[in-house]
Every structure is written in C-alpha cells, then in structure tokens.
Amino acid sequence: MIGVLYSILDIASVNMAEYLEREHGFEEIDEGSACASSRKACIIKTSKSLLELDELDKYNFELIYFLSKHSSAKGIAAFTTHPTGNWTKEAKLGGKPYELSYSAPLEMLGILREFKKANNYGLEISYEATHHGPLLKTPSLFVEVGGNNDAVSNKEYAKVTGEAVYNLIYNDDVEFSKVVIGIGNTHYPTKFSELALNKGYAFAHMLPKHAIEGNGDNVFMLEQAVKRTKNEVEIAVIDWKSLNSETRAKVISKLNELGLDYERV
C-alpha cells in the first residue's frame, strides 16, 4: 500500500489531492484511519503541517508521497521533488538534528520526468537538496509546486503534480542508469537535475554545499545518505568546484571508508 499525504493547511496540497480524487478515484481517509486493503494507494488528510508527521511509519506503507506547496525566497515558480532529513545540528522545520529519512530515488527520478513531459507552462523543474522533516523509516518523497502565490494556488499546475504522482503509482517501473548520492552544489542542484533527466541518474540524498559544516565536519552523514534509501546506492556524484580542497579530502576519505566510488561533475 502506498500513502499519499496532504494537509488542509496547504492550498497546493489540497488542489493536488482533490485532482487525484476527482479524476482518478483515489480514496481519502482521515489521519489515523485505515486504508481499504484492496487499493494500491490511498490519500490521507491531515490538519497538521506535513513536516511534523514523524508517526507515519505506523501505517506500514511501502512508500509515501507528500503533496506540498513549494516555497522560494526569490518567488520563482517551479515543480520540485526531494527527500527529507537534516544534515546539521539544526532541525527548525521538523525531523531531528543529524538524521535523514529513507529516500525514494527511482520515484523522484520518475517525478522529474513526468514534470518535464507535462511542463507546458515554462516553470523550473528541479530536485531540491535533502531538507526538513518529517523523519521516517518508510521511503518517502515530497512532490511540490509553487514558488509564489499564483503558482501555489494554480489548479493547472496542481494537475501536473497530481498526474505525475498517479503515473508513478500505477504505471511501469522507472528506468534508470544508476542510483547515486549528490554532494555539493546548491539547494537547487542544477547539475544533479540535469544528470537525472539526461542520463538517468537517480539521486537518493543530496548534501548541498551550504549544509556542510565547517570544512566537512559533518561528512559522517554520508553513511546515512548511502544506507537510508529504498534502492542501493552505487556511486557518489561530487560537484567538484563547489567544495574547497579540505572539504573534498574529507568527503573522499569518508566515501573510501564506505567503499563507494565517485564521479566529478
């Protein structure tokens, strides 16, 4: 069973859920209720922030999609997807310090592809680096649209995101070349998104430059990035020039310890 979570506090989330219910007959239940066992997926409504739902492992879902608005300081409209977790000692937006959730790399790759196919609106399409809560052992991903008020409330954009989730749940398996983790780059890791869309790299977790403490003091988190994922990680991808030499050395040392090779981009 697959869970699809939406929050009544989030208009984009509501619009996506309503689309799935109206167009594809998804069953909706309230948080704490049971899904019909005959269905492949169901929608769960919550009155809480999606970032606070650390208790969802109790449902024993095989996978969880979070339908969410996207926030952008620059107001850039975008379709995005990302895993959850906190790389640092801070956990201001849910989850716990120095804890990553289990990621869903193939589903995130599939969502990016669905966005690209349906994006007739000129919105940005991107991964976001791993950030915020909730903290879960169940593999999960956020599927988002927004960046500004118009994009958040746009029902045509919600249709794109809703249809992407539907297609990933009910259509064929995602083809990919390799499952990887990403190190460096920015919160919107353009190079990683391009590798996903052009070469089929399925990113599990992404550690952006700004979340690296000091000159690599928290590279121990790479072990979680490799182990906490639905699919086995084969290699790391490092945005070489975004890291200084001391940080690169610590990253490579940790990757060697984990027995993981790397590519420079």
Predicted regions: what they are:
Residues M1-H131, L135-K137, N148-N149, K155-K159, ...:
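N-terminal catalytic or cofactor-binding beta/alpha core of small enzyme domains
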